[in-house]
Amino acid sequence: GEDPAEISCHGSQYIVSEILRLLTASGARMAGPGEFTIRAYLAGKLDLSQAEAVADIIASSSRAAHALAANQMRGGYSDALEGLCEKLLELTALLELELDFSEEEVEFADRAQLREAMQRIGAHIDALRNSFTLGNAIKEGVAVAITGAPNVGKSTLLNRLLNEERVLVSDIAGTTRDVIEERINIDGVVFRFLDTAGIRATDDRLEQMGIQRTMSSIERAQIVIYMTDAARLAAGAPVAPEFPLRADQKLLVLVNKTDTAPDCPLPEGTIGISARNGDGIESLRRILRSFVDTEALYHGDAIVSNNRHYEALTAAGDALRR
């Protein structure tokens, strides 16, 4: 909405600097961070959600996160909100007509029609709200908690996924006391791996604190990797985790150190790996990536990734149902 002026000059840094010096001496100034986005918003060229998406594009660290932000900047989320607003206005108009002519023998919509309209709007809001699980995970990274008993190879697994010795590995049980977080890009999606303290009964106060942090990491993870090893299986250790999981959490049970017991039968539903020599790691990467369905990103579907948008939709849904 503003008239621009473009200066084409020689590529010399001195010439560019001199032009900028002359312009600023004549009253011009350098643009501040995000100033062109602000001007576009104030001029009505972008709405607030599109302006927020500009920052998300700049901060995106994966192909999926970039596609998500680009879709929002193109107006995908704005279009979904516009459709929602139209439905709400239609419902409001019907309610106002009923109130204005309540004493007349005129019925513009019966209660069943109004209830059905409210249910459709509620379903629209819920669909947007539910997309936040995927949107936020793509934007912030999919949280994956690596859990299990001490010395089953959790830190070795993280090092193998990173292809570097990032985490200290030791034969001494309880070496990992704090949660170590690392980000890994798997086929265009960022995963946040949380290497946690081994879970066991202990009197060590410091180790107990580490286990408490492990449980907190499990609670906020989208995917939980529960690790055991071939020796523990042979000794009758439980295959399934002994801590509760949410219904929406994905669980992977890994049997590590299969190279030390190649004849050990794997229980149904488990995945055999060797974090030390890399056996099964590529298969694990593919399984993790399959948990994140990004097809909707490339079809233009509206996906919520902003906490403010999610809270506003939650408030709208609550108000509709009151």
Please give the residue ranges for each predicted region.
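N-terminal accessory targeting/assembly segments
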Residues: 1-50, 61
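Conserved G/P- and acidic residue-centered "switch" motifs that form tight phosphate/ATP-binding loops
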Residues: 44, 151, 195
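C-terminal-of-GTPase-core extension/linker across diverse P-loop GTPases
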Residues: 63-186, 202-204, 220, 230-322
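Conserved nucleotide-sensing/catalytic segment adjacent to the nucleotide-binding pocket
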Residues: 188-205, 210
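Short, Asp-centered acidic motifs that coordinate Mg2+ and/or phosphate
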Residues: 191, 223, 252
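Generic enzyme active-site microenvironment
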Residues: 193, 227, 254
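Inter-motif core of Ras-like GTPase G domains
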Residues: 207-231
